């Protein structure tokens, strides 16, 4: 049975969409998570994305959470699926389950490696990379195949890659292997905006691009992202601007910077991929409201 997907319908109609990431719990309780997802849905999010054990730390499974949210809230979901933790059999089994639950979009990524200190107990799998994973996912659909219609596969795009020419070439290869579009790393510098422009210029309209927007909430947060999180670059003037601010002031500044970055990214993007810092749902409700009133009011 074909699924009526409100997110894809809106995206393919040329309307700007809002996807928002909310990390799954570290324990077995989904109560607060579902409450947060419901608030983000009410605020106007078109899609909820769930990371797959980011920085290789175990959390509740992204695909299971996606199914629960989709089933209980009716909100479109995009579980991330890494190549790090599953072999081909486990990947196929999970994809078939997602399809049966009505979750028809996935984000295929290679995934952060297991920290060296933990590799005696936890093993990397990496049977394939994100391009091969995308190719495999789309190969499951068709006459006589396991899925009657294809899943939609998105990928990641690092606007902050040191060699952006290589990143652009890989993006083209990902499209050739079945991906439909990209969610980018956070736009937190003018160079990231320029690389987003180059991406649109190079890939044209064949790729759907959601520009990553993540509010910085403190100087410590900015420094950590700059130094410790792969693929993120925070401009120096942004880091300096948070010096001496308390929580309320930090959130207010982070909100304004996010809106500025979103405004600059808008001409080159099909929508936004919002990342929730420290599960601060109230902050993201404010960001969505202002995006809708200040940037997307004509939709």
Regions found by a protein language model. Name each.
Residues 3-8, 111, 124-146, 158-161, ...:
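Active-site pocket-lining/capping segments in soluble small-molecule metabolic enzymes
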Residues 18-24, 48-50, 77-81, 106-108, ...:
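Hydrophobic faces of well-ordered beta-strands that scaffold small-molecule active sites
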Residues 43, 72, 101, 177, ...:
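Structural motif
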Residues 44-84:
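Active-site cofactor/substrate anionic-group-binding motifs, chiefly glycine-
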Residues 2-10, 29-31, 56-68, 87-93, ...:
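Active-site-adjacent beta->alpha loops and helix N-cap segments on the catalytic face
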Residues 17-32, 77-89, 151-166, 242-256:
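Active-site mouth loops of central-metabolism enzymes
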């Amino acid at each position: 049975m074909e699924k009526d997907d409100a997110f894809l319908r809106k995206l393919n109609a040329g309307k700007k969409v809002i996807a928002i990431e909310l990390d799954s719990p570290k324990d077995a309780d989904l109560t607060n998570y579902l409450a947060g997802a419901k608030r983000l849905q009410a605020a106007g999010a078109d899609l909820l994305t769930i990371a797959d054990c980011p920085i290789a730390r175990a959390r509740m499974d992204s695909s299971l959470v996606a199914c629960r949210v989709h089933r209980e809230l009716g909100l479109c979901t995009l579980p991330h699926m890494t190549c790090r933790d599953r072999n081909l059999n486990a990947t196929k089994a999970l994809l078939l389950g997602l399809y049966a639950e009505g979750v028809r979009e996935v984000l295929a990524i290679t995934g952060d490696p297991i920290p060296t200190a933990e590799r005696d107990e936890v093993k990397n799998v990496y049977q394939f990379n994100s391009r091969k994973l995308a190719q495999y996912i789309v190969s499951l659909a068709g006459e006589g195949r396991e899925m009657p219609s294809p899943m939609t596969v998105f990928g990641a795009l690092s606007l902050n890659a040191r060699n952006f020419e290589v990143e652009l070439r890989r993006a083209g290869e990902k499209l050739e292997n079945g991906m439909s579009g990209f969610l980018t790393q956070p736009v937190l510098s003018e160079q990231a905006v320029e690389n987003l422009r180059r991406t649109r210029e190079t890939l044209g309209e064949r790729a759907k691009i959601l520009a990553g927007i993540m509010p910085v909430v403190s100087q410590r947060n900015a420094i950590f992202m700059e130094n410790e999180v792969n693929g993120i670059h925070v401009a120096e003037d942004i880091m300096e601007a948070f010096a001496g601010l308390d929580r309320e002031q930090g959130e207010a500044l982070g909100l304004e910077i996010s809106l500025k970055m979103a405004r600059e990214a808008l001409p080159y993007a099909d929508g936004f991929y919002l990342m929730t810092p420290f599960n601060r749902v109230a902050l993201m409700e404010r960001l969505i409201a202002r995006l809708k009133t200040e940037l997307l009011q004509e939709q």
